[in-house]
Amino acid sequence: MRGVIPNYHHSYTLFFFVILVLFPHVFSTNTLSPNEALTISSNKTLVSPGDVFELGFFKTTTRNSPDGTDRWYLGIWYKTTSGHRTYVWVANRDNALHNSMGTLKISHASLVLLDHSNTPVWSTNFTGVAHLPVTAELLANGNFVLRDSKTNDLDRFMWQSFDYPVDTLLPEMKLGRNLIGSENEKILTSWKSPTDPSSGDFSFILETEGFLHEFYLLKNEFKVYRTGPWNGVRFNGIPKMQNWSYIDNSFIDNNEEVAYSFQVNNNHNIHTRFRMSSTGYLQVITWTKTVPQRNMFWSFPEDTCDLYKVCGPYAYCDMHTSPTCNCIKGFVPKNAGRWDLRDMSGGCVRSSKLSCGEGDGFLRMSQMKLPETSEAVVDKRIGLKECREKCVRDCNCTGYANMDIMNGGSGCVMWTGELDDMRKYNAGGQDLYVKVAAASLVPS
């Protein structure tokens, strides 16, 4: 119509405003470029592809805060959970921002978190060679990464949050240690409390000093629980791992690294994470996108028999006996008086000495959590028969077992010290062959 000019500008503005309100995720981004910054005041976040994870600032109020003031952190959480927010990573867990002025930006090929006075409180501190510009990305699996502009390998990063776990292990993360270079050890450390993300009392760490590797749950520096060694399928001391049908477990043990990792198979609607809780339990927590309520799939320590060295040397724990601690056949309580008073931590001693020769025999114990492996040696080339012969010839040998239970069993684990921290299961576990004096094998 002549004389009427359609106001397309206002129409488009209104249209995009409506879209932004109704579908805010359409405009979300997972990248941070060198000319951008995330600030507390802007309330902007990075959202991973698939809308599962979100990175941004969050605050907590703790009793330890001066005057109960808020503390601010840069972290990653599940965007898909309703109600209580579930955090999976915190950058500055032990160096909080003490007011609502904080900035995350890229500076000199590193991510830097600045406080109100532009003082760095956290940084990736990248020291290698980078092709500028670099970008930061929150990936679909929850990994926050820094990469340079010339990298064509999508799995190669200058820095990644997966190398610096907090209290949570996500699918595709690794827990363990690199054996080359000066890369950090990857462990889980609990929050100090449910509302304080600073480092707590409990940690979950892979022991890599011996021939076999197993995880320990520590309270400060004291061992609370041991998983048992990896047996080719699962950790020997966690029989329930065989029931984790939707989890693919893997253990890497080579010249470059020793680490555990897992992935969720088949059903991508399932979210699973391992969490070292502030109360001292390693938890496997799972939920689905359709039912966001979190379920505790598994938690340890589960019972008294899970506690580290609860029965002492040459004794095993069994939840189906009373008392729960039992001396191995051919052994007697080291201190009978304390044993009768249910103080069994001293363990047991041999009732008959070994002859160190063919006069000794072996007691087969089924469905066992294998003893602590710090005093064990490994020979991957031989089987159970050769392992027995080797143990017979070694007067220091106290027991042996298969290293790997796959395909009927292979490899040899041989203990040369006290057998400690054992338990018997109703199902699962492994066969353990304990060297005993011939007299101990005679039926009573």
Curated annotation (Swiss-Prot):
Residues 31-159 form the Bulb-type lectin domain. It holds the Pfam family PAN_2. Glycans are attached at residues 43, 125, 243, 396. Residues 356-437 form the PAN domain. Residues 1-28 form the signal peptide. The keyword Hydrolase does not apply. GO terms for biological process: rejection of self pollen. Keywords: Disulfide bond, Glycoprotein, Self-incompatibility, Signal. Stigma. SMART domains: B_lectin, PAN_AP. Disulfide bonds join 387-412, 395-397. It comes from the Eukaryota. The keyword Coiled coil does not apply. Involved in sporophytic self-incompatibility system (the inability of flowering plants to achieve self-fertilization). PANTHER family: BULB-TYPE LECTIN DOMAIN-CONTAINING PROTEIN, S GLYCOPROTEIN. This is S-locus-specific glycoprotein. It comes from Brassica oleracea var. alboglabra (Chinese kale). The gene is SLSG.
